[in-house]
């Protein structure tokens, strides 16, 4: 199979309607991948702020649960919580970190910040690169790349997003009510919908089908996915600057389509397929 064959397959976008129902520009990494990076934060990133080190030691699972909150932007509007549309905002993240008064709140805020930090690479590089390689069918390509990565790392998780949302629904709902203009009931309904949707899609095994198909069409997929995981993980130590009050210069939400295409257009085809150059310092102004 060739990349040309994959482009032809992706033209038949109607095959992927079930996937598109749960995919949007708000998502970059899937929920499984966000929990993976939050686990990496717990294990491998030395935090310089003592309060957050204490929070991680006391409530590690709340860090993982907090990493699921930003993706409520997909469902909040359907449960009377339109304020959840704006979850990928750095100033909102800073307010959460600064206002956290307990170890549990700090753990949730840390997981939330971790989500946004790694989304910089996903929105600005991972997703646009795969759209460039696999064909100009953005929503479908986005969904396939996202779910394929989730399947790539799923066996490394110690808890699924659905398990985390269900087990910590009271702490999550209270945290969301505190930081967004919504009721605790709306927050809980949004969490339940996100949890059920994630469980439904995992049960359907669509993510496995995406992974198998992508691997068949793209023989460098596993190598490239590991590159993104390694390089994104290597930049997670920069979360210490966020904890100290700094704000990255890169957006954690989807950039404009023209800008994203220009960025990946600067890379040679072999870089897109293998090791795309990524920004080293997320606090430096984005070039061009």
Residue ranges of model-derived segments:
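N-terminal leader/auxiliary helical segments
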Residues: 2-111, 117-288
């Amino acid at each position: 199979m060739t990349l040309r064959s994959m482009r032809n397959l992706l033209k038949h976008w109607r095959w992927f309607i079930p996937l598109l129902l749960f995919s949007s520009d708000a998502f970059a990494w899937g929920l499984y991948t966000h929990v993976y990076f939050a686990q990496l934060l717990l294990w491998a990133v030395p935090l310089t702020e003592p309060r957050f080190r204490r929070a991680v030691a006391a409530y590690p699972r709340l860090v993982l649960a907090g990493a699921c909150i930003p993706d409520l932007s997909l469902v909040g509007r359907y449960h009377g919580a339109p304020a959840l549309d704006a979850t990928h905002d750095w100033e909102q993240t800073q307010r959460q970190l600064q206002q956290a008064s307990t170890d549990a709140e700090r753990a949730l805020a840390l997981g939330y910040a971790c989500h946004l930090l790694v989304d910089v690479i996903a929105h600005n590089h991972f997703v646009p690169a795969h759209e460039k390689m696999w064909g100009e069918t953005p929503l479908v390509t986005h969904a396939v790349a996202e779910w394929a990565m989730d399947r790539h790392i799923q066996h490394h998780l110690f808890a699924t997003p659905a398990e985390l949302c269900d087990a910590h629904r009271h702490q999550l709902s209270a945290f969301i009510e505190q930081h967004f203009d919504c009721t605790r009931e709306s927050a809980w309904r949004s969490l339940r919908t996100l949890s059920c949707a994630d469980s439904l899609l995992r049960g359907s095994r669509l993510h496995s089908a995406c992974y198998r198909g992508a691997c068949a069409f793209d023989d460098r997929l596993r190598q490239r996915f590991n590159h993104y995981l390694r390089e994104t993980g290597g930049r997670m130590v920069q979360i210490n600057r966020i904890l100290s009050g700094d704000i990255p210069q890169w957006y954690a939400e989807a950039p404009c389509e023209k800008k994203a295409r220009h960025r990946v257009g600067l890379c040679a085809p072999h870089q897109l397929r293998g090791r795309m150059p990524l920004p080293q310092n997320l606090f430096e102004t984005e070039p061009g």
